[in-house]
Protein backbone atom coordinates (compact mmCIF):
# COMPACT_ATOMS: atom_id res chain seq x y z
CA UNK A 1 0.00 0.00 0.00
CA UNK A 2 2.83 2.55 0.17
CA UNK A 3 3.25 5.11 -2.56
CA UNK A 4 6.64 6.17 -3.86
CA UNK A 5 6.87 9.93 -4.37
CA UNK A 6 9.96 9.60 -6.57
CA UNK A 7 12.57 7.13 -7.78
CA UNK A 8 16.33 7.30 -7.43
CA UNK A 9 18.27 8.48 -10.43
CA UNK A 10 20.05 5.82 -12.49
CA UNK A 11 23.33 7.15 -11.08
CA UNK A 12 22.24 6.20 -7.54
CA UNK A 13 20.50 2.94 -8.46
CA UNK A 14 23.31 0.47 -8.03
CA UNK A 15 24.88 -1.78 -5.39
CA UNK A 16 27.64 0.73 -4.65
CA UNK A 17 25.53 3.72 -3.65
CA UNK A 18 25.82 4.50 0.03
CA UNK A 19 22.82 5.13 2.26
CA UNK A 20 24.11 8.65 2.84
CA UNK A 21 24.11 9.41 -0.89
CA UNK A 22 20.53 8.13 -1.15
CA UNK A 23 19.38 10.14 1.89
CA UNK A 24 20.98 13.36 0.62
CA UNK A 25 19.38 12.80 -2.79
CA UNK A 26 15.98 12.25 -1.13
CA UNK A 27 16.31 15.38 1.00
CA UNK A 28 17.01 17.44 -2.10
CA UNK A 29 14.21 15.82 -4.14
CA UNK A 30 11.59 16.66 -1.51
CA UNK A 31 13.14 20.10 -0.89
CA UNK A 32 13.50 19.54 2.85
CA UNK A 33 17.00 20.96 3.31
CA UNK A 34 15.61 23.49 5.79
CA UNK A 35 14.29 20.80 8.17
CA UNK A 36 16.49 20.59 11.26
CA UNK A 37 16.59 16.77 11.41
CA UNK A 38 16.03 13.81 9.14
CA UNK A 39 15.64 10.14 9.96
CA UNK A 40 16.56 7.27 7.68
CA UNK A 41 14.74 4.04 8.55
CA UNK A 42 15.97 0.94 6.78
CA UNK A 43 13.38 -1.43 5.30
CA UNK A 44 15.10 -4.28 7.15
CA UNK A 45 14.45 -2.65 10.55
CA UNK A 46 11.64 -5.09 11.31
CA UNK A 47 12.37 -5.29 15.04
CA UNK A 48 12.55 -1.52 15.56
CA UNK A 49 9.90 -0.19 17.91
CA UNK A 50 8.20 3.18 18.06
CA UNK A 51 9.93 3.88 21.39
CA UNK A 52 13.34 3.51 19.70
CA UNK A 53 12.50 6.25 17.20
CA UNK A 54 10.94 8.49 19.86
CA UNK A 55 13.91 8.05 22.22
CA UNK A 56 16.38 8.59 19.41
CA UNK A 57 14.72 11.81 18.29
CA UNK A 58 14.54 13.10 21.87
CA UNK A 59 18.20 12.30 22.49
CA UNK A 60 19.57 13.97 19.36
CA UNK A 61 17.63 17.11 20.28
CA UNK A 62 18.52 17.13 24.00
CA UNK A 63 22.23 16.44 23.43
CA UNK A 64 22.40 18.81 20.44
CA UNK A 65 24.22 16.05 18.58
CA UNK A 66 24.81 16.05 14.85
CA UNK A 67 24.04 12.34 14.35
CA UNK A 68 22.35 9.64 16.40
CA UNK A 69 23.14 5.99 15.81
CA UNK A 70 21.35 3.08 17.51
CA UNK A 71 23.99 0.64 18.74
CA UNK A 72 24.13 -2.76 20.38
CA UNK A 73 26.88 -4.74 22.04
CA UNK A 74 28.72 -7.52 20.28
CA UNK A 75 27.86 -10.99 21.52
CA UNK A 76 31.57 -11.79 21.21
CA UNK A 77 34.64 -9.57 21.15
CA UNK A 78 35.62 -8.42 17.67
CA UNK A 79 39.17 -8.14 19.01
CA UNK A 80 39.59 -11.95 19.01
CA UNK A 81 38.67 -12.93 15.46
CA UNK A 82 40.13 -15.88 13.64
CA UNK A 83 40.97 -15.76 9.96
CA UNK A 84 41.41 -18.54 7.45
CA UNK A 85 44.63 -19.11 5.61
CA UNK A 86 45.34 -21.83 3.13
CA UNK A 87 42.49 -24.26 2.65
CA UNK A 88 42.45 -25.89 6.10
CA UNK A 89 43.91 -23.52 8.66
CA UNK A 90 42.92 -20.66 10.92
CA UNK A 91 44.91 -18.26 13.07
CA UNK A 92 44.29 -15.30 15.35
CA UNK A 93 43.96 -12.12 13.37
CA UNK A 94 45.39 -10.02 16.23
CA UNK A 95 48.20 -11.74 18.11
CA UNK A 96 48.04 -8.98 20.72
CA UNK A 97 44.79 -10.44 22.11
CA UNK A 98 45.30 -14.18 21.61
CA UNK A 99 46.03 -14.78 25.31
CA UNK A 100 43.45 -12.32 26.62
CA UNK A 101 40.22 -13.74 27.98
CA UNK A 102 37.24 -12.35 26.09
CA UNK A 103 35.67 -11.04 29.33
CA UNK A 104 38.84 -8.96 29.92
CA UNK A 105 38.57 -7.15 26.60
CA UNK A 106 36.81 -3.77 26.39
CA UNK A 107 33.12 -3.85 25.55
CA UNK A 108 32.64 -2.62 22.01
CA UNK A 109 29.50 -1.74 20.08
CA UNK A 110 28.28 -1.70 16.50
CA UNK A 111 25.49 0.12 14.76
CA UNK A 112 22.26 -1.83 14.45
CA UNK A 113 21.74 -1.01 10.78
CA UNK A 114 18.13 -0.05 11.50
CA UNK A 115 17.79 3.74 11.49
CA UNK A 116 19.78 6.94 11.86
CA UNK A 117 18.94 10.51 12.82
CA UNK A 118 20.89 13.33 11.21
CA UNK A 119 21.10 17.05 11.77
CA UNK A 120 20.37 18.03 8.19
CA UNK A 121 22.92 20.84 7.83
CA UNK A 122 25.74 18.58 9.08
CA UNK A 123 24.70 15.66 6.88
CA UNK A 124 24.66 17.85 3.77
CA UNK A 125 28.07 19.31 4.66
CA UNK A 126 29.85 16.13 5.83
CA UNK A 127 28.28 13.77 3.28
CA UNK A 128 28.37 10.83 5.66
CA UNK A 129 31.62 11.39 7.54
CA UNK A 130 30.89 10.66 11.18
CA UNK A 131 31.00 13.95 13.11
CA UNK A 132 32.51 14.23 16.59
CA UNK A 133 29.11 15.08 18.02
CA UNK A 134 27.58 11.68 17.32
CA UNK A 135 25.43 10.21 20.06
CA UNK A 136 23.70 6.86 20.40
CA UNK A 137 20.88 4.91 21.96
CA UNK A 138 21.44 1.37 23.14
CA UNK A 139 19.26 -1.36 21.63
CA UNK A 140 19.10 -4.78 23.26
CA UNK A 141 20.79 -7.42 21.07
CA UNK A 142 17.63 -9.52 21.07
CA UNK A 143 15.91 -6.72 19.11
CA UNK A 144 18.38 -6.23 16.33
CA UNK A 145 19.69 -8.13 13.34
CA UNK A 146 21.32 -6.44 10.39
CA UNK A 147 19.59 -8.21 7.52
CA UNK A 148 21.95 -8.70 4.59
CA UNK A 149 21.66 -12.42 3.84
CA UNK A 150 18.77 -14.93 3.82
CA UNK A 151 20.12 -16.44 7.06
CA UNK A 152 19.85 -13.01 8.74
CA UNK A 153 16.15 -12.88 7.88
CA UNK A 154 15.63 -16.31 9.45
CA UNK A 155 17.34 -15.09 12.63
CA UNK A 156 15.20 -11.94 12.67
CA UNK A 157 12.03 -14.03 12.35
CA UNK A 158 13.13 -16.17 15.30
CA UNK A 159 13.82 -13.02 17.32
CA UNK A 160 10.43 -11.59 16.37
CA UNK A 161 8.62 -14.75 17.46
CA UNK A 162 10.59 -14.85 20.71
CA UNK A 163 9.78 -11.20 21.46
CA UNK A 164 6.12 -11.81 20.62
CA UNK A 165 6.05 -14.81 22.99
CA UNK A 166 7.73 -12.83 25.76
CA UNK A 167 5.22 -9.99 25.36
CA UNK A 168 2.27 -12.41 25.28
CA UNK A 169 3.42 -14.22 28.42
CA UNK A 170 4.30 -11.00 30.25
CA UNK A 171 7.96 -11.84 30.77
State each model region's role.
Residues 2-39, 47-55:
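Short phosphate-binding loop-to-helix
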Amino acid sequence: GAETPFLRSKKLSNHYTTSTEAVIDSIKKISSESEKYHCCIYPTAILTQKKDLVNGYKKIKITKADYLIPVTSYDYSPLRPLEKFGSNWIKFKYNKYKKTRSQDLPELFHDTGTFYFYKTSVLLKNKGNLPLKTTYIMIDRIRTTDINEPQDLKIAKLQYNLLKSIKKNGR
